[in-house]
């Protein structure tokens, strides 16, 4: 629930390609740490909690347990590896949802197999599993356009995560290709640049689709 079969299959496929299971065969603890930003564990957020449930179910099949660690906003701004991320406590680390660049950099010296899930920092050279947000949003927007919509809204702050930015690029591309002018009134943010929930300020003239 909340995670498509395609995403699930992609996670398993790439994990095998990255030989994550091979690293874990030599494990000693039987635990994998999953680090997720605090903002993605709020009550109304279901995407990452759904992914975690799926990862947990798959880990159990391999006789591993996942240990969830919620990274607070303060920790992201004052990066240091949590005590959980040590070779005598876990055999690998999954970073679930985009964490601040400096926080991810602070984890590099721990020398444990690490995978970024649903985000990437290309300059760090870490393994990642990402969905194709650009193409996915492009197809979704084209679908609406083909059904006659020209006033299409977008919800998300593109400064917050790579995923939101990539979705916007797919949305933008579909509108441009179809000769539809981007209307700034229909670009809505539900969070500010500090990732605080600010609610949606709806325009006086609403788009016909989102």
Give residue ranges: language-model regions.
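Amphipathic helical "hinge" segments at domain boundaries
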Residues: 18-81, 89, 169-172
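Active-site-adjacent beta->alpha loops and helix N-cap segments on the catalytic face
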Residues: 100-111
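Bacterial carbohydrate/catabolite-sensing allosteric modules
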Residues: 13-21, 51-66, 109-116, 121-210
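Short acidic/histidine-rich motifs immediately flanking catalytic phosphotransfer sites
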Residues: 86-92, 204-209
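Short beta->alpha connector loops
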Residues: 72-76, 95-101
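Glycine/Thr-rich phosphate-binding loops of Rossmann-like dinucleotide-binding domains
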Residues: 42-43, 103-104, 125, 162
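Structural motif
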Residues: 33-35, 94-96, 209
């Amino acid at each position: 629930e909340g995670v498509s079969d395609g995403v699930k299959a992609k996670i398993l496929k790439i994990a095998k390609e990255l030989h994550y299971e091979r690293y874990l065969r030599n494990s000693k603890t039987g635990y994998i740490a999953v680090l997720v930003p605090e903002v993605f564990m709020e009550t109304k957020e279901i995407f990452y909690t759904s992914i975690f449930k799926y990862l947990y179910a798959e880990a159990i099949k391999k006789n591993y347990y996942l240990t969830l660690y919620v990274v607070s906003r303060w920790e992201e701004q004052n990066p240091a590896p949590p005590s959980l991320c040590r070779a005598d406590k876990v055999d690998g680390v999954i970073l679930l949802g985009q964490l601040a660049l400096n926080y991810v950099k602070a984890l590099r010296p721990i020398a444990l197999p690490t995978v970024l899930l649903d985000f990437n920092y290309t300059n760090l050279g870490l393994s990642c599993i990402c969905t194709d947000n650009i193409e996915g949003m492009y197809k979704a927007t084209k679908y609406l356009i083909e059904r006659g919509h020209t006033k299409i809204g977008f919800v998300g702050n593109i400064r917050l995560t790579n995923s939101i930015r990539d979705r916007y690029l797919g949305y933008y591309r579909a509108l441009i290709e179809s000769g539809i002018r981007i209307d700034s009134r229909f670009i809505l943010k539900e969070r500010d640049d500090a990732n605080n929930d600010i609610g949606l300020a709806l325009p006086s003239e609403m788009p016909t689709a989102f």
